[in-house]
Amino acid sequence: MSVYRLFTVSIMDMCVLKANCKDPLGFTVEYTCVFGISSPIPGLHGGEHVNSYGEGVCVITFHNKDGRVFWFIIEKLPKKYTYPISPRFTPQDASEFCGRLADVHVFNDVTVGHLWRNRTVVSMNALEEGLLSTWSFERMVLLGDSVHKMTPNIGQGANTAIEDAAALASLIHQMINPMTPQNASKAAIGHLFQKFQDLRMSRVQSTVQRAHFGARFHTRDDHLKALVGRYIFPYVGNLVMARTVKVIGGGHKIEFLPPPKRSMPWTAQTDHSQHKMHGSKVLWAYLSHPDQHWSDDPRGTAQLRSQSLGTHRTSTVGRTLFIELVIVMIDVVYARQDIGEDVNAGVKDMAVQSRNSMRFLPYVLSYGSTESLLAAGWRQVWVFRLLSYLFGALLGL
């Protein structure tokens, strides 16, 4: 638990706080993580990011431009803990943990053993998860991990804390701005803190839910997640990345400072309708040109590699049909997590996404039939691609 949150809660208790404070210890632990930094490893290239999914364990790596590898190995614990009861780990625990998983593949021939042997920094911690309903008391306010904690699977823990700070700074600046002076009384400050929580709660709740789902999806927590993670996600990495970027783009910024110049403009300045591609369109493009990278935004993509342990990309009719049909489920899973701000940023609701996915089913069948001909010996690939374009045009893709 954060020292600051513990201190605030103790003051609340001493003052016999009458406000709603039902969850002062509301964090749970279901996963553990070994975090490390390693020197460059052959096969893991700078600027790339790898997600490797397995049974009960996943490996996430980020590689900087100099080749250094930042990595997380996340494993589900045998039991669930509720704070303040939480497991603690030593360097010896981390060594035994990585030794037990040394042969687990990260990407191609790279294994956990390579990460461990090249380590320069390593630590092992329990991963707390949760979102508290009370963020402030009188003139004290909490933000970041002190009120919302998540696993690192979607990489938004620190970003969410930074967004908290930006939103709070903007509200404080608004209060003390000489052009619009406001009374900084105890009541006014309490109102400001409540406004801050109300402003952030919806987005933070969505982010915590996405991280919660991500941890369980990456570790194949049930049969459905295992099915999609093993046979679908290795083929739609850019689609996932594009949607993730769209969600991140809706973050709160410091309102009284101009946005820095970047290659990508701020979300509020971007017309998403100019470069929107639905999931079915991305797959159609991928199937027509499997050697290309595809993204929602034509201005460029990052290199993301997704690997499901034990999966090999063999071109079969059954695999193709299966991948195309399950895209309906992928759209629905993402749409179920949409909130108001996502819709405003250009993410369609579940009904529209499902309808667009179902429109894609006729093309699925046509593609499968065409690949059957190819498998039977009809090797004129240009004919296959012509048919792909034709069916795509007929369906308005």
Curated annotation (Swiss-Prot):
Disruption phenotype: Impairs the synthesis of terretonin but accumulates dimethylorsellinate through the decomposition of an unstable intermediate.
Gene it is expressed from: trt8
EC number, as in UniProt: 1.-.-.-
Cofactor requirements of the protein: FAD
Record key words, sorted: FAD, Flavoprotein, Monooxygenase, NADP, Oxidoreductase
Active site: 53
A GO MF term: FAD binding
Pathway it works in: Secondary metabolite biosynthesis; terpenoid biosynthesis
Family: Belongs to the paxM FAD-dependent monooxygenase family.
Name used for this protein in its record: FAD-dependent monooxygenase trt8
